[in-house]
């Protein structure tokens, strides 16, 4: 990561806190607009710039997609430094707000999360996804009280820095799944409500596509809700009518790009054909123009 974004925290030159705070506020307002905030997640500078070019008002990253692109499996296997470097490159590539998927924040204590929040802000992010799973099969969920303290640490630390980041607090009750099916809705509401009260701006329940449950959850949590879109989920228009504030794609956009690349590779071997390649190629001049714009 280039040092000038970190200098603020190392006793040197100051970064433009005012501009970053304005981006954070813009991102926050997008969760309360008349339209759903649709976020096909980016994984590198060029994917982020494409999203900005076609008109997306904010960029979200996908931790899985970033990890895959750098040669790692998902699940916080990529190092803290490599993840922050990737976020830094993305935030420098675009002018719109960037919210970063940072998994469980590379820390087990509120103090470690507070330090990570400083590094995240230094990387240019004005929002983050923050999840509540440990990765331990015997104790999948971070204890609720501890997770609440971590969210408060993010809120308080970012406010002290002058960049009140947008916290998208995630629970994986439905995604994992965790607990008997009959208890999952109540577990989800309990966790998301606690995260809301701790200072989260948006609440994220990946793995949930059932229309009735989504509608109930929107009413139960009383805060902007993020749904991870997947096969079988309601459309963006439907989600918007149900009151969902934000819809994200996770690693799906990156996997779609990789699926296209895989088909091209197979066509070259199996058929000696490059027709599929030519049909989906972004023109060289267009991509070069897009990337020639000065970085921030």
Regions found by a protein language model. Name each.
Residues 241-243, 263-264:
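Short, surface-exposed amphipathic charged segments that create phosphate/polyanion-binding patches used
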Residues 1-4, 40:
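Classical N-terminal secretory signal peptides
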Residues 16-20, 27, 252-296:
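Extended, intrinsically disordered, low-complexity segments
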Residues 18-30, 37-97, 104-227, 233-242, ...:
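Alpha/beta enzyme core
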Residues 3-14:
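Short, Lys/Arg-enriched N-terminal segments with co-localized hydrophobic residues
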């Amino acid at each position: 990561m280039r040092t000038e974004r970190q200098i603020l925290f190392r006793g040197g030159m100051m970064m433009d806190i005012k501009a970053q705070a304005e981006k954070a506020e813009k991102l926050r307002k997008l969760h309360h607009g008349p339209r759903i905030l649709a976020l096909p997640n980016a994984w590198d500078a060029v994917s982020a710039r494409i999203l900005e070019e076609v008109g997306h008002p904010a960029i979200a990253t996908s931790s899985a997609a970033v990890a895959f692109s750098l040669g790692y499996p998902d699940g916080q296997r990529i190092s803290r430094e490599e993840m922050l470097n990737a976020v830094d490159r993305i935030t420098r590539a675009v002018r719109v707000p960037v919210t970063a998927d940072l998994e469980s924040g590379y820390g087990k204590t509120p103090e470690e999360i507070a330090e990570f929040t400083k590094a995240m802000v230094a990387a240019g992010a004005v929002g983050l996804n923050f999840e509540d799973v440990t990765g331990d099969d015997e104790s999948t969920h971070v204890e609720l009280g501890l997770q609440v303290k971590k969210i408060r640490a993010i809120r308080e630390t970012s406010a002290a820095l002058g960049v009140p980041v947008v916290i998208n607090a995630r629970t994986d009750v439905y995604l994992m799944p965790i607990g008997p099916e009959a208890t999952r809705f109540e577990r989800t509401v309990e966790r998301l409500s606690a995260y809301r009260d701790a200072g989260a701006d948006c609440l994220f329940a990946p793995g949930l596509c059932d229309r009735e449950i989504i509608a109930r959850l929107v009413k139960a949590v009383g805060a902007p809700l993020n749904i991870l879109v997947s096969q079988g989920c309601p459309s963006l228009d439907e989600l918007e009518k149900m009151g969902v504030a934000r819809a994200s794609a996770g690693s799906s956009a990156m996997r779609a790009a990789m699926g296209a690349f895989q088909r091209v590779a197979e066509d070259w071997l199996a058929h000696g054909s490059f027709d599929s390649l030519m049909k989906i190629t972004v023109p060289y001049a267009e991509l070069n123009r897009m990337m020639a714009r000065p970085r921030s």
